[in-house]
Amino acid sequence: MISVTDIRRAFLDNECHTITKAFGYLHEDNAIALIKIGFHPTYLPKVLYNNVVEFVPEKLYLFKPRTVAPLDLISTITKLKNVDKFASHINYHKNSILITGDKSLIVKCMPYMIISDDDIRFIREQFVGTNSIEYILSFINKESIYRMSYQFSENEIVTIINRDHFMYEPIYEHQVLDSDFLKTMLDRYGIVPINSGIIDELCPEAIIEILMAVVRPRDAIRFLDIVNKNQLTEDSVKNYIINDIRRGKIDYYIPYVEDFLEDRTEDLGIYANIFFEDAIDITKLDITKTELEHISKYMNYYTTYIDHIVNIILQNNYIDILASIIDYVQDVLTEELCIRIVCESTNPVPVTSLPIHSTLVMVMCIQMKYVDIVEFLDEIDIDTLIEKGADPITEYTFTTRWYNKHNDLITLYIKKYGFCPMMMKRLMFEYPLTKEASDHLLKTMDENRGAIMFFPRTICTLPYLLCCNYKLIQKPIPFKEENRNIVYKKNNRVLCFDSLENSAFKSLIKIDSIPGLKTYNMKDITYEKSNNIICVRFIPQESIHNEERRIKLQLFDIARLASYGLYYIPSRYLSSWTPVVNMIEGREYTNPQKIECLVILDLFSEEFIEYQNLGNAVSNKYELEYTISNYQAAINCLMSTLLIYLVLGSIRSISKTEDFVLSILNIFYKGLKINELLSEPVSGVCIELNKIKDRASSGDSSFIFLKKNELSKTLSLCEKVCVETILDNNQSFKSSK
């Protein structure tokens, strides 16, 4: 349980109405300790500034921009890859950043700064060369474009749009463009020429051709606004638009129809009532299912005929359409119809739109995995919800007032997340708790210290263990005496590094000292310094030609290196997958969407990071919003690596899949020097891996996309292995299981 004793005391002693207010009364040391673990309000008092600068500078965004010193800001954001949370601070200190920052820092900050014409002139003077200014300007934001008079070249426009497609809108509004360029951009990128440069090229045929390319209602409306009215009255244009409306593109043409089609209501058919009040008696029409689907979004224009529409829907069993207009048909909904809507409609309906909140309806919503089950609390007590298997605590619940209405819901939240700084921060500092709800929350947490509320299941889950202050043991690397009496052949290799402090060089030297590695492709390493360059000579290891054996031994090396505090980051395979971040934020995670490479490649020293630097390295590699701990980063590395070697290894394996999986797990444990035996069957994992293997074998792609939850069993296995790794590294905790 997160300790809130000091916060509770401050809350009571100072008669605070919010927990945020109470946080401001904490002793600085206590406040900083909580800030370090990510448990803090959305803003901090000035009195904590110096301590935050010293101990957790990445949290400077919690102060108002004017409170943050420019040099402190620049020093901090220079080290971070993801600076989204510093957006207002970056813009506030724009001048200091432009004057002080180098090219890479300015590029990093460009999306957040409101750039003026004077700023562009300054950047041109600072960074001479067309390519430099074009590259820097490619990161500009739309707010800057709306405020400047600078005219972008066609090359600059293409560069900007290649980086962010939707930047076409402010650019096209900003300046008149050549018609040939506009046509090229339409053909190449599908960008509608909403620019006065195209006006002289327009004719009815061209207007229709452009409308055929439109995919956003806003673009259609804005394009028609610049067209000459005489051309908009052409019959060919009118006929095309009427047909487009009948195809369901209603939002695209609402202003146009009201101005130009008042005399064509008969041609509009059932859709006429959307634009003109009760223009058509729809009871005289033969209404199709497609038409009902199209008009369901606009049911407020058909209230006169709602009974007629409902009769058609029920006669034809169009449950999906009934669900889409549920707010207009409350009087006809029985319990049976509510259940049918819940079970048969493609898209979930809001529970608040279901007029009957019976236990049976609730059970159906649970089975269909509705996220707003909490709304049944207006009729059903929380114990019944839990008994039926409901989880009323979801992302949706934060959008409601239920936490202030039900103290039992807060207690349930604490049982689920009381160990998680991120999730408790959301409820305590970001949700508008009343004074009474805040008091109940603090009292419950303070009176249930330790892990008492999390026994017996939660304490052995990976999300719980990741939020606890555990560590992974790093065995000391044995000293290896350097041997300089090595005879190198002409075909032996040389690597060069810029300094002895280069992280890849330091990893290489440490790796060379670790005994028992099987596949690391460098042996007999020596190095010398020459002209400020570190030259490393080595003899390549002999290749292992049996692919399956190579993969297994390579995983052993990765695990063995981890046991000595050198962790492998598999970003070449998984470029954006960080399951640990989801877990410490209390969110569900699924398998990665894509594996970038289907071949297990050789290992290189620069891919291994020392444990004490791992949190920063992983956070920057994946451009996270905050820095995770070394411990959390290590588990992310282990889990990602194990997943990759299971999936890609099984694709290459010629063994029976079950034998391969068990062998991989044994090798992984052996490399980590963990004495564990998997007691659970892996048949479900094998089924998933075999499906991936079949798919990969049938194609010739160098990568593979994964469907959501396609590897759920495999991920569960990886989680269990990580849990065992943590428990083995923290034996005192393991003994209390």
UniProtKB/Swiss-Prot annotation:
Does the keyword Heme belong to this entry?
no
Signals that turn on the gene? Expressed in the early phase of the viral replicative cycle.
Presence of keyword Disulfide bond: yes
Disulphide-bridged cysteine pairs: C496-C535
In terms of superkingdom, the source organism counts as Viruses
Report what the Swiss-Prot or TrEMBL entry states about this protein's PTMs.
N-acetylated on initiator methionine by host.
Entry keywords, A to Z:
Acetylation, Disulfide bond, Early protein
Q: Which residues carry this modification: N-acetylmethionine?
A: M1
What subunit structure does UniProt give?
Interacts with host KLC2; this interaction promotes IEV trafficking by engaging the host kinesin-1 complex. Interacts with protein OPG056.
- What does the record give as the function of this protein? Plays a role in intracellular enveloped virus (IEV) transport to the cell surface on microtubules. Together with protein OPG056, forms a complex that interacts with host KLC2 (kinesin light chain isoform 2) to engage the kinesin-1 complex and thereby promote IEV trafficking.
Q: Which family does it belong to?
A: Belongs to the orthopoxvirus OPG064 family.
UniProt protein name:
Protein OPG064
Q: Which organism is it from?
A: Vaccinia virus (strain Copenhagen) (VACV)
Task: Give the gene that encodes this protein.
Answer: OPG064
